[in-house]
Amino acid sequence: MVMADQPTMFDPHERTSWYIDDAIVRLRLWGTEYAHPLPEPPAPRVSLKLGSADTCAVQLRDKAGRLSREHAMLVPEATGWEIHDLGSKNGLWVAGARTTKATLQAGVKIRLGGLTLVAESLKFVGLRSLVCRLLGWAPERHAEVDEALQSLRDSAIERTPLILIGSGDLAPVAARLHRVILGPEAPFLAYDGSDVSAAIHAAMNGTLCVPIRGHARASAIADAVHAVEITARPRLVLCASKASQAAALGGKPGQFAVIAMPPLSARGDEVLRIVHEAGQDLAREMGAQSTGFTTHDLERLQTFKFSGMDDLEDSLRRVIVMRVWGVTAGAKKLGLKHSSLSTWARSKNRNLST
């Protein structure tokens, strides 16, 4: 096997606007919460050995027994952390390719023996938190969360088309993910059924979000996006309400990645955590210092039968503006009439105070 002598480097701004380009702060074991923190300034940055030996700064346990005692070395460079193979028997694999050394970028997979690690920055940790909110925090969801994170990274960097499966309007979910992985300045367009060419042009270097309302239409849009030169091609996100819609597009060029969101009705005790985390994000976006949620609000919100994440966020916005600005000013902030917001809150199935 021919091995590259030069470090494998991925410039997130050369072909993409991958927004998660901050410093690597930890290595996390794939499919788990177990992470190895790395030194950060002002702490001195020194080279760190990875392996099974107790003399390694990052000591790892490989049940498969394929990890060398001194398998790899993390080396601090001006551009960030580099990882070097130390002549290990089973080699160093970064982003799916065997190499002797590579510069670590946020989200990249590192395979050492029978172990897979993920290089994480603070922004990437934030993205993982969002994906856990969408998919679940339970241990049995951890591997699925990591697969989704890789799909999002591939969508941003490689323009791999993505299918989101879930209940309700998924465009707001796609938009939130877009802002995290591509940044707030990158264009995002929710397709409304108008001219496809104009929509693709408007979403260049950003994201084109398309609801799957018919296989033929979605397939034609996917073909049109795929025909665009990759450096300008928008990321394509197709939104489906059921897995069968995604399966019908499985053979299209570019190999679709799929992220399936479980219904909120199946999230059980996690709903309260979703409300807290989503509420904090929404309050910050609206310029509020806190959500203002009362104990009664939280009790009532847990009983709501939300149609999807968009419905949940819409409800949280309404409660936040009422608590922070009051019904009159809050309704105005959302572009609603005072009576509309008040009626919504006092309806029998909500029973929220105003």
Question: Over which residues does each language-model region extend?
Answer:
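Forkhead-associated
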Residues: 39-111, 178-180
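Bacterial C-terminal helix-turn-helix
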Residues: 1-4, 15-19, 28, 35, ...
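Intrinsically disordered, low-complexity acidic Ser/Thr-rich regulatory segments
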Residues: 1-63, 136, 146-150
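Flexible glycine-/small-residue-rich
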Residues: 52, 76, 85, 114, ...
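C-terminal boundary/linker segments immediately following FHA domains
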Residues: 1-11, 20-23, 44, 76, ...
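AAA+ ATPase active-site-proximal loops
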Residues: 130-258, 262-268, 272, 280, ...
